[in-house]
Amino acid sequence: MSFITKAACVGGGVIGGAWVARFALAGIDVKIFDPHPEAERIIGEVMANAERAYAMLTMAPLPPKGKLTFCKSIEEAVEGADWIQESVPERLELKRGVITKIDAAARPDALIGSSTSGLLPSDLQSEMHHPERMFVAHPYNPVYLLPLVELVGGKKTSKATIERAMQGVEQIGMKGVVIAKEIEAFVGDRLLEALWREALWLIQDDICHTETLDNVMRYSFGMRWAQMGLFETYRIAGGEAGMRHFLAQFGPCLKWPWTKFTDVVDLDDALVEKIGAQSDAQAAGRSIRELERIRDENLVGIMHALKSGNGGEGWGAGKLLADFEAKLWANARKPEADLGDVKPLRILDTKVSAAWVDYNGHMTEHRYLQVFGDTSDGVLRLIGVDLDYVRDGHSYYTVETHIRNLGDEASGEALYSTCQILSSDEKRLHIFSTIYNAATNEAVATAEQMMLHVDSKAGKAVAAPEAVLSKLRAITEAHAQLQTPDGAGRFVGQKRA
């Protein structure tokens, strides 16, 4: 169920700005209040990172990006919003005051979520007139990529609010987990705090440097945790005897001196300088923006790997990505066209994302194929071959493609694609697609493709049903009146006339 059409973000820092990106890239208009003088620049940079990451994350058609509006007051920002996300600095009095002000100005049925990392929702909602609609929605950085949100209700939060919050995070491609009882720092940050305290002791006691510690994590158990978490990882460690055997085998270790995390390290100036210097050396001159982009690329790669796991059904965050993509395809706008028009079908309008640009500074090869693939998918949806059709066991498979690259497109350039049907019969579909620069209307690439209608379960070509063929014939007959496009029928290496 989709109920968020307008969102408001109060606070636009690292977390708040990423919430803005998450909402906007889900097609939701966002109004923002942040008194920081450079809030627009900061959020703009977060948006650029998010759009770059999404271009790598999925080939599914995203909805039109939501409109961003920067406001001069909390009251202006929250007016008319369905979901309001508070992300101001982690100070109880400040957060409680901001949330109380939001509550006074917001629509009575608007949800109010707080990004707090550890404050209790009962404390945050104590001065509200409508505390039943306030809850903690604690995300993880970067919010636009990491899907988890811890949903924590306070003493006065209604059950209906948490249920609606679950629907809301699902709408924007996230995974909500409901924490049964409120506790400071919830679940994730309590685990992170335990690990963080032990890590500080290891650096303080000169056991290792920051880079060594990070290497221990990223080359070993960090990889396991990304796809199986803690308990499932240890279940496997118990072998065929399972978790009970593991607990019996390693239980005695709990009494051994293997940790100091219950002792709080003195984070004095000397330790801060030691960690700061080691971290600077580890970064090797990379800026925060560079590190963010490396992180995002790696997260995308992990999610892609998880999407293909579990026999292709997806696992963990990858299964969530697959489900989100299925919804994007189901909600994709169908190309609008008169099937009898004597002109190529205009299918796709897009822009060259920064993630599409290679080391030569222009759009890389496989992205042209992606645009042509999206174009042919648009044509298929036009004749009734959509996701439901594919789920029923039939589809069109591409069996041959010839692409010509005619221009060099830079990041940010607007493109559109057209498709002309050269011929079709009961099983075959022969198309010629062209990508144009939207500013100049010059062709920048063409693709000639042959597709076969198949029974995907039987693994063989079969005739398409009349419901599809009737639409296909109408387009084919209209396009038969067009001239054969330049480049159709060419072979690789053929000299131009």
Curated annotation (Swiss-Prot):
Spans annotated as L-carnitine dehydrogenase: 1-335
GO cellular component terms given for this protein: cytoplasm
The protein's Enzyme Commission number: 1.1.1.108, 3.1.2.33
Pathway recorded for this protein: Amine and polyamine metabolism; carnitine metabolism
UniProt keyword Ribosomal protein present: no
Region (Important for dehydrogenase activity): 330-335
Keywords in alphabetical order: Cytoplasm, Hydrolase, Multifunctional enzyme, NAD, Oxidoreductase
GO function term, MF aspect, one: NAD+ binding
Residues annotated to bind NAD(+): G11, G12, G13, V14, I15, G16
UniProt superkingdom: Bacteria
Main location: cytoplasm
Catalytic activity: carnitine + NAD(+) = 3-dehydrocarnitine + NADH + H(+); N,N,N-trimethylglycyl-CoA + H2O = glycine betaine + CoA + H(+)
Classification via Gene3D superfamilies: Hotdog Thioesterase, N-(1-d-carboxylethyl)-l-norvaline Dehydrogenase, domain 2, NAD(P)-binding Rossmann-like Domain
InterPro entries hit by this protein: 3-OHacyl-CoA_DH_NAD-bd, 3HC_DH_C, 6-PGluconate_DH-like_C_sf, 6PGD_dom2, HotDog_dom_sf, L-carnitine_dehydrogenase, NAD(P)-bd_dom_sf
Cited Pfam families: 3HCDH, 3HCDH_N, 4HBT_2
Region Betainyl-CoA thioesterase, annotated ranges: 336-497
GO biological process, one term: carnitine catabolic process
Subcellular location(s) per record: Cytoplasm
Cited HAMAP family: L_carnitine_dehydrog
Subunit structure: Homodimer.
NCBIfam families xrefs: PRK07531.1
PANTHER family assigned to the protein according to its UniProt record, in alphabetical order: 3-HYDROXYACYL-COA DEHYDROGENASE FAMILY PROTEIN, 3-HYDROXYBUTYRYL-COA DEHYDROGENASE
Similarity remark: In the N-terminal section; belongs to the 3-hydroxyacyl-CoA dehydrogenase family. L-carnitine dehydrogenase subfamily. In the C-terminal section; belongs to the betainyl-CoA thioesterase family.
General function of this protein: Catalyzes the NAD(+)-dependent oxidation of L-carnitine to 3-dehydrocarnitine. Probably also catalyzes the cleavage of betainyl-CoA (N,N,N-trimethylglycyl-CoA) into glycine betaine and coenzyme A. Despite a high similarity to 3-hydroxyacyl-CoA dehydrogenases, cannot dehydrogenate 3-hydroxybutylate and 3-hydroxybutyl-CoA. Is probably involved in a L-carnitine degradation pathway that allows Rhizobium sp. YS-240 to grow on L-carnitine as the sole source of carbon and nitrogen.
Record's protein name: L-carnitine dehydrogenase/betainyl-CoA thioesterase
